[in-house]
Amino acid sequence: MRPTDTSNFAPAEISKRKVRRVKANGRERARMHGLNNALDMLREYIPITTQHQKLSKIETLRLARNYIDALQRMLQTNEQPTPLEYAHTLANGLSQTTTNMLANLLQVQPRQLLPPSQFDIFSDPSHHQLHPSHPPPHSSFSSSSPSSSCSPPQYYYSPTQPSAAPLQGSCDPQYQQMYHQHSHQNTFNYSP
């Protein structure tokens, strides 16, 4: 901010400007406190909680978006992802540090979450195949077919509850028909 030449202003005008600036600063400070409090509350519900390293604002929002996406896909497909599939979903667009924390939390190797480098093409003669760390595009969370006619996901990760929480499903025939239709229509797309 440029210094203002105050020699042309009356003392009353200078005083009014200072008061307005102090009020504006107070409003901005209150707005930032509200935003920070909301982000702290959000951090309690995402997989990397405050028990771990505190995430930046943007990492918190990205992880929350990915977590919502993962939960939504679990509900749509009615399947529980493998830890690696779940980690891929959560790590989408996150920094390497956050990705490493997720890998540790979900007990997968961090290198399995790395996108394939452009040099993999030259070192791997089967470069036309998918990189082993990435699931095939348009695959569902789980490639295994249901063992029974009523097989909703058994558990999902809840950061506020250390143990997994059971998901509910229905074994009524209408539910089974709807489940089987949706499990073949809804697929999970991964973005490398």
Curated annotation (Swiss-Prot):
InterPro entries attached to this UniProt entry: bHLH_dom, bHLH_transcription_factors, HLH_DNA-bd_sf, NeuroD_DUF
Region entry Disordered, spans: 116-192
Any Pfam family: Neuro_bHLH
Keywords attached to this entry: Activator, Developmental protein, Differentiation, DNA-binding, Neurogenesis, Nucleus, Transcription, Transcription regulation
Transcription regulation listed as a keyword: yes
SUPFAM superfamilies: HLH, helix-loop-helix DNA-binding domain
Gene Ontology BP annotations: axon development; axonal fasciculation; negative regulation of gliogenesis; neuron differentiation; positive regulation of transcription by RNA polymerase II; sensory organ development
Cellular compartments annotated: Nucleus
Ranges where the bHLH domain occurs: 19-71
Coiled coil: none
Biological function: Acts as a transcriptional regulator whose activity is required for several aspects of motor neuron fate specification, including cell division patterns, proper spatiotemporal expression of fate-specific markers, and normal axonal morphology and pathfinding. Involved in regulating glial specification.
Name assigned to this protein: Neurogenic differentiation factor 1
Gene symbol of the encoding locus: cnd-1
